[in-house]
């Protein structure tokens, strides 16, 4: 099963994702391949749609995953099927799960000010201020160059 994971890792790396994202996506496929070898005792190309649906229900039930996480797993199974197994994918056979939209809680200006003031280092204060005021992600701020500003 390692050759499937290696092929997946190679194909997914072509998408230009961060190392953290690549690791997470590989974790979904590793879990799937482990399930196939230990529970179904099948190769990935021999798995039916019914067995894929059972696996998704098993993920939701046994690991208590959120619908968002299950959708991410389905998305990676789709990529794996299309680009590693070179088999067609039918969205009607394994639809994405619905989930409730929610608004994230945002700290008040006073809370952010207290947090930034508590930071001992000027560099940390500058990075936190930039993240808060611009909406950049941590990885984006860490990779900023002087020319970018």
Where are these regions (language model features)?
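Conserved catalytic core of the tyrosine transesterase superfamily
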Residues: 1-149
